[in-house]
Amino acid sequence: MSLIEIDGSYGEGGGQILRTAVGMSALTGEPVRIYNIRANRPRPGLSHQHLHAVKAVAEICDAECEGLEIGSTEIVFEPGKVKGGEYEVDIGTAGSVTLLLQAVKLAAIAADGPVEMEVRGGTDVKWSPPVDYEINVNAHYLDRLGYRYELEVLRRGHYPRGGGIVRARMEPPKRLKPLEAVKFGELESVRGISHCVRLPPHVAERQAKAASEIIERELGIRPEIEIETYPKGRDPHLGPGSGIVLWAEDDQGNRIGADALGEKGKPAEVVGREAAEQLVQRLRTGMALDEHMGDQILPFLAIADGESVFGVTGVDPHLPTNAWVVEKFLPVSVEIRGKEGEPATVEVRPEG
C-alpha cells in the first residue's frame, strides 16, 4: 500500500496541516502518513484538540489509524468510505469546535448522505474562527460553491472551561462551483453579533457601541450589531466570556469578517474597537476575502468544477501551507501572487 507522505513541520507547521491532510485523505480515499507533527511547537505532537479532530474524521469514514495518542508526532490514516449519519464528539476541553469542523466538513463532501454532528468544546476561543464567523462568513462562501453547511449554537464555550455545544449539518454536494471573487465591490452593509455570557449585559453593549462608532466614522455606514446576553439565573453557560464578530458585505455577495475576544482585564471598548479596526483595515485592501477565509476555502476550490481566482486581504501563513498539502492529494496547481502578510490574488486550477 502506498501512502501519501506529509511532513507536519512544513511551512506554518501547526495543526492546520494535520486537519487538511486528514480531511483530504477521507475525501480522496488516499491513505496518508503525517510525521513531524507540530515538531516546532513548544509541546510537539498531537494535542487533545488535534486528537479529537482526527478521531472525528476517522469515525465518519471508518478509518484505520496508527499513532493516535496525545504527544504523538506521527500518524497513519487509512480511510474507508465516508458515511452520512448522526455523530457526537466531545472535545472535553475548550478545544475549538470550528477547527475540528474544518477537517470534518472537507471529508463530508464524499459522504453518501448528510452528515450531522454535535460537537462539544470551545465556540469562542483564541487562535480559531469564532462560531459566528463560521456561520456568517465561512458557511456563506461554501453555500456559494454549492455546499450546504449549517450550524446551530446550543451553548457557547469559552476558555478555560469550554462546554459549548454546536450542531452541524453538512449536505454533500453533487459538484462544487468555482469561485471568482477578486475585488470587494461597493459596501452594502456591516453586520455583527456582540455577546457575553456569565457577565453583565453592558459588556456586550459596550463592545457593540465601540465597534459601531469606528465603523460609522471610518466607513460612513451604520452597522447592525445584534446584542446577545443572558439574564442572571437563566444563563446555561459555564463562562464567563465575551466576544464580537463583524462582517461587511458588498453588492456582489462577498463578505469580509473580523473578530475580537474579551479577556480578563481587557475593557469591552477595547474588544469592540479591535474588531472594528481590523475590519476597516481589511476593507481598505480592496480584496474580496479576508486572510482567514482565503486559506479555509482553498481545499474546496481544489475539487471545484473549473478554475477559481480570488483576492485575499493578506496572505496568512496557513495559505501556502494548505496549498502544499492539497497539491499532495490532487492534480491541482495553486498560484499565490503576493507576499506573506500582504494582499494577494490566488489562482486555483484543478487539472483532473
From Swiss-Prot:
Active site: H318
Metal-binding listed as a keyword: no
Reactions that this protein is recorded to catalyse: a 3'-end 3'-phospho-ribonucleotide-RNA + ATP = a 3'-end 2',3'-cyclophospho-ribonucleotide-RNA + AMP + diphosphate
UniProt GO molecular function: ATP binding; RNA-3'-phosphate cyclase activity
InterPro entries hit by this protein: RNA3'-term_phos_cycl_insert (IPR013791), RNA3'_phos_cyclase_dom (IPR023797), RNA3'_phos_cyclase_dom_sf (IPR037136), RNA3'_term_phos_cyc (IPR000228), RNA3'_term_phos_cyc_type_1 (IPR017770), RNA3'_term_phos_cycl-like_CS (IPR020719), RNA3'P_cycl/enolpyr_Trfase_a/b (IPR013792), RPTC_insert (IPR036553)
Family membership noted in the UniProt record: Belongs to the RNA 3'-terminal cyclase family. Type 1 subfamily.
Protein name: RNA 3'-terminal phosphate cyclase
Source organism of this protein record: Methanopyrus kandleri (strain AV19 / DSM 6324 / JCM 9639 / NBRC 100938)
Biological classification of the source: Archaea, Methanobacteriati, Methanobacteriota, Methanomada group, Methanopyri
